Amino acid sequence: MAARLPLAACVVAFHLCLLLSSLVRSPSTALRRLSEAESSLVRHGHGVGIRPAYHFLPAKNWQNDPNGPMYHNGVYHMFYQYNPLGAMWQPGNLSWGHSVSRDLVNWDALDTALDPTAPFDYNGCWSGSATILPGGIPALLYTGRIDADKEVQVQNVAFPKNPADPLLREWVKPAYNPVIPLPADVPGDNFRDPTTAWVGRDGLWRIAVAAKVGGPNGIASTLIYRSKDFRHWKRNASPLYTSRAAGMVECPDLFPVAEPGVEEGRLGYASGPASGAVRHVLKLSVMNTTQDYYAVGRYDDVADTFVPEVDVERNADDCRTWRRFDYGHVYASKSFFDSSKNRRVLWAWANESDSQDNDIARGWSGVQTVPRKVWLDEDGKQVRQWPIEEIETLRSKRVVGLLGAQVNAGGVNKITGVGAQADVEAIFEIPSLEEAETFQPNWLLDPQKLCEENGASVPGKVGPFGLLVMASSNMQEHTAIFFRVFRHNQKYKVLMCTDLTRSTGRDNVYKPSYGGFVDIDIEQQGRTISLRTLIDHSVVESFGGGGRTCITARVYPEHAENKNSHVFVFNNGTGLVKVSKLEAWRLAMASVNVVHGR
């Protein structure tokens, strides 16, 4: 592949030189600063008790999809869907917010990178991706919404005005946009979200774009486009992947994964898929379920098609049966390759679950999950995720408690010293699995329903056991993250749940139960299972079984305004559970996009 890059480099460089005569400017000049009133609202206003302290969010207003995260010349860039005019989704106002960081934890806000100012995007600059071109020049591919009445979506490109600017503060849109117009066989409102581009063995660039082909009732498709110059794109005859049952998919993401024990950086790519000998992950966000699904499989880099490798209980042709990156309240995830540390990093949008009126009153809405490292599990069937190591720099006071403690049936033990801003790691040991309840096969494809019917307050045999977080002193409010173990075909099935039914005393809040199965052999693990939970006021991210199953939740306890939250270990099963490891840390506040007024 590297031998083919000079052809693409020469052609792309030629077209970049022509930009100065055909630019549509995107205004962006300085750090976005808060007025004194705005800064006061962020620090002291309504809802400050639930505002995250170390998760990524703008100082104010609405954000949704992560767009074009990248590492460039020593700086991390985060672009995101942003409404500069308020704390609600207004599709015609959507811009690309832009922040920069040296460590993926602390962020400085810049002015918006892309605003809906041109004929090819004047009803919204929607989601897309970043690609580092030969010569080190980044490019942004994004969806432009050009007709709100007819809902026409097209694909555009933008480049930095000054590539030598280390912060890439200003971006320009060539007047030759759109680079990909709406296809004749795709409805106007179903063509969006171009991926990071990659170069095939033939020297041509490729991107994938989500579409519904064949009309309003058409087939959910991930289309492939090819180009030699990053300007003129031609659609491939075959889609990368189709799913008739899915309706409409969004925000596709295709990337290679190294076999277990091999660093991803040795695959020899920096921005997209590698050769057909390497296994890949395809992620699709399904609009009618608002969930992200992925499969490990084979990408044919000649035909530009993807074949999922799925278990017998899953359907390769229906992506809604695939595994999920997160079984909680996240959507529109986007990954990038971090060349500085040879790792793939994943972001995802965690929307609010509160009422829109409360979002508006607070003045902000939407956060991103903590950035997660992603790699292929040893079983070759699933990926694992873990908070990037930089999150650990926020750890301050360390608490070691309950080590070796036995939690009897109905027991609740407090972890003293941590509350609403914490990182908790625990390993639970089950002395005996003999009493595990029998698993019913019809539970397999709906773990969330199983969690809803068997919440933390429902006693079981082996479980529920786990953590109670964001808990009030009287336990009337709490969020439960727990496991249940079932007997299944001479082995055991582990269910992980996050139960929000008692997360708040308020009624106008979405309080579901989330759930996913943890694909491990708990007997081979010595009858143990691990849980790591990051607590950040209204955000609770949990990683079960070493990151094989992840659940993110948004919670809004009334007691949070009093800043008096607690963490407990609990066991509501009939058998005892041993806490063989428990470490917890208070986490410091990160500096995230808050700049005091002038």
Curated annotation (Swiss-Prot):
Disulfide bonds join 451-497. Not inhibited by sucrose. Residues 1-30 form the signal peptide. Coiled coil: none annotated. Transmembrane segments: none annotated. It catalyses: Hydrolysis of terminal, non-reducing (2->6)-linked beta-D-fructofuranose residues in fructans. It is an enzyme of class 3 (hydrolase). Glycans are attached at residues 93, 288, 351, 572. Its EC number is 3.2.1.154. GO terms for molecular function: fructan beta-(2,6)-fructosidase activity. This is Fructan 6-exohydrolase. The gene is 6-FEH.
